[in-house]
Amino acid sequence: MSYLIKPKNYKPLLDLKQTELGIKQIKEFFQLNLSSELRLRRVTAPLFVLKGMGINDDLNGIERPVSFPIKDLGDAQAEVVHSLAKWKRLTLADYNIEPGYGIYTDMNAIRSDEELGNLHSLYVDQWDWERVITNEDRNVEFLKEIVNRIYAAMIRTEYMVYEMYPQIKPCLPQKLHFIHSEELRQLYPNLEPKCREHAICQKYGAVFIIGIGCKLSDGKKHDGRAPDYDDYTSTGLNNLPGLNGDLLLWDDVLQRSIELSSMGVRVDREALQRQLKEENEEERLKLYFHKRLMDDTLPLSIGGGIGQSRLCMFYLRKAHIGEIQASIWPEDMRKECEELDIHLI
């Protein structure tokens, strides 16, 4: 079901022309900073991949990819990507990228099963990035170093926005707070996972939650994660499982946390087998991507995605992602948004 958060007394700080210019400036500035911080080269990415190769991202395992037959390939099915998590690792191998360097790309996707609302659209645009690492880098301290580099690019971008539009005051804390999902559960034992995120983000402003996908002490997961890209079972922070996580910010306009990025150290052979077994998904080992990983023809890597529209929405203090990108929305949502001074593109 669709949803609509209705912020009180919302007034856009920028008109439509300023918003479009701001989007352009943010995207250009941030990707240059991201590239230099992580030593990433831009590459061209696919909008769709062949079905049955194990390349598409399964997200939480329940979302249906948009698919279509290809006439010239005997009606073989292609799938619009959900993300490029596994494709990027194949590309690192194809480009023979050295450790310490990587790639980034503009990822465009269609997620037809999204519950549409302020933060969720049918259309997903993000910077997908992947960097080659060594076995010695497969630890939580290295993960935190990479996260802090990305956050540094976010801080600089926020100041650029302030220079261009002085009415938009910087609000990001200088330091990002790290916490494991199990520690977060123990901190707020009576709250559901999403409410825990809101509580911790309201307190610190910017938070990275480590260990997304691993089972917590209550037998549940903080959130789902496909078992074949992020390593969420190897020992990490404070001897707790997980070398991955989500970066979240407190949004003053919506008065809630927003997830801007998911990232992590990727599975090696052992972690892949362990996580597939845990999820009863060992059949996937027969797929092309998984065979490549098991044959040691893919490099060890770290990677993630950063939401472009959400990042722009945060910087420009917008109440709805539809103020940043063009998409399809329920007619009743469009009418309500107009009444609230939320102008959907």
Swiss-Prot record:
SUPFAM superfamilies: Class II aaRS and biotin synthetases. One of its GO terms (molecular function) is ATP binding. Its EC number is 6.3.1.1. Pathway: Amino-acid biosynthesis; L-asparagine biosynthesis; L-asparagine from L-aspartate (ammonia route): step 1/1. The keyword Nucleotide-binding applies. Keywords: Amino-acid biosynthesis, Asparagine biosynthesis, ATP-binding, Cytoplasm, Ligase, Nucleotide-binding. The keyword 4Fe-4S does not apply. It comes from the Bacteria. It catalyses: L-aspartate + NH4(+) + ATP = L-asparagine + AMP + diphosphate + H(+). GO terms for cellular component: cytosol. GO terms for biological process: asparagine biosynthetic process; L-asparagine biosynthetic process. Belongs to the class-II aminoacyl-tRNA synthetase family. AsnA subfamily. HAMAP family: AsnA. This is Aspartate--ammonia ligase. The gene is asnA.
